[in-house]
Amino acid sequence: MDPCKFRPSSSFDTKTTTTNAGQPVWNDNEALTVGPRGPILLEDYHLLEKIAHFARERIPERVVHARGASAKGFFECTHDVTGLTCADFLRAPGARTPVIVRFSTVIHERGSPETIRDPRGFAVKFYTREGNWDLLGNNFPVFFIRDGIKFPDVIHAFKPNPKSHVQEYWRVFDFLSHHPESLHTFFFLFDDVGIPTDYRHMDGFGVNTYTFVSRAGKSHYVKFHWRPTCGVSCLMDDEATLVGGKNHSHATQDLYDSIDAGNFPEWKLFVQVIDPDEEDRFDFDPLDDTKTWPEDLVPLQPVGRLVLDRNVDNFFNENEQLAFGPGLVVPGIYYSDDKMLQCRVFAYADTQRYRLGPNYLMLPVNAPKCGFKNNHYDGAMNFMHRDEEVDYYPSRHAPLRHAEPASFPVPTRPVVGKREKTRIKKENDFVQPGERYRSWAPDRQDRFVRRFSDALAHPKVSHELRVIWIDFLSKCDKSCGMKVANRLNVKPSM
């Protein structure tokens, strides 16, 4: 029997019900009992299998980004970037690559409203000819912290109180009062862009700094930007309350219905690049994910377009079992020493192994569409057909060999230093948030002040914490801090 032809698929559905092993089920309406009113018999294998499977339908939800929706489509390279990267899928304008994209909220559980003031995830899996590349980002270009060792803490602070299971902002302000670098993200979260109208009308950002590597081995730091062709649209607070009260899944439904109607969402991909030899000319660290790269200093360069033209065939298979990881890169794209990215490379793969199992990359939605070969054998739920006799390397009995080093160039800059746990030198946490605030119209500034003040007004936010945050805001913009202080009737310390 062909081991691949009859692998489980709805393509081979029978006309009558069966067990998972294929035995006919002659009655799926009544359990097997002793007489019409007698006890149920344990020999009713179909009943036991049905109940046991039902009890195990749910898998652990993602610790973050649990609430999400996916769609499929393609990425098309539209501009020549071969001088920056040797990535095959960017080899020439017109080259197309199949993709699957997952949008999500961040903090709350699966099934929570999609109108919550919360960052949105924007993750893209490129099925390239040289393996899968996962670009994971958010709709904000910055993050709350810059060092991955604090990632569990910041998520714990935003998650519901472990005692009451209620999300409370006093916990957020308490923790992040030790991390003023979080201010920049707050100037997005409490801004008008804090609640996207839907997934089609929001930006996407890679957030972390990656590295482009050219065929010649030249490296450039790179940041990725997605811009929707239909423009950015967001909900005001009262609109979000109204929309969320009617439909908790409005963004998921909008994405599905739009694609179903032939109104395909599209984004343009842009990059910013910095020569590592010139990084010292900036007043911030280019590897700090709490900072943006000013577009007047580092202009956007067009790369391609992303089009979503197909809905998923099955939500569980292609959304819940869909697994992303920043560690999945392809030749021409590499990591940087961004501290958050370095931690994410391990963390995401590890959480997928917990959530889906050690062979999660064998699941059809996660498997590459190109050929692949390694000696990773066995493990729970391994369903890959293999008939080799050699499962080690090297061997004189098997033709497996290493890829040529030139096929996967990596950055070659030397790294020299002593072992230490320390902060980066160029923190500069208040300049960019202040510049962003001053770029807004007065009414937009007022809405930000109101939202921030309302959050700080939580009864468990102490006077000390309010003074700290007003001091932070004042360092960004003196008038902003003063307005928040006046709303809270707090005298600022400066």
Curated annotation (Swiss-Prot):
Ranges of compositional bias, category Polar residues: 8-22
Enzyme class: oxidoreductase
GO-annotated molecular function: catalase activity; heme binding; metal ion binding
Catalytic activity: 2 H2O2 = O2 + 2 H2O
Cofactor: heme
GO process annotations (BP): hydrogen peroxide catabolic process; response to hormone; response to hydrogen peroxide
Chain residue ranges for the region called Disordered: 1-29
Active site: 65, 138
Subunit structure: Homotetramer.
Official protein name in the record: Catalase isozyme 2
Lineage of the species this protein comes from: Eukaryota, Viridiplantae, Streptophyta, Embryophyta, Tracheophyta
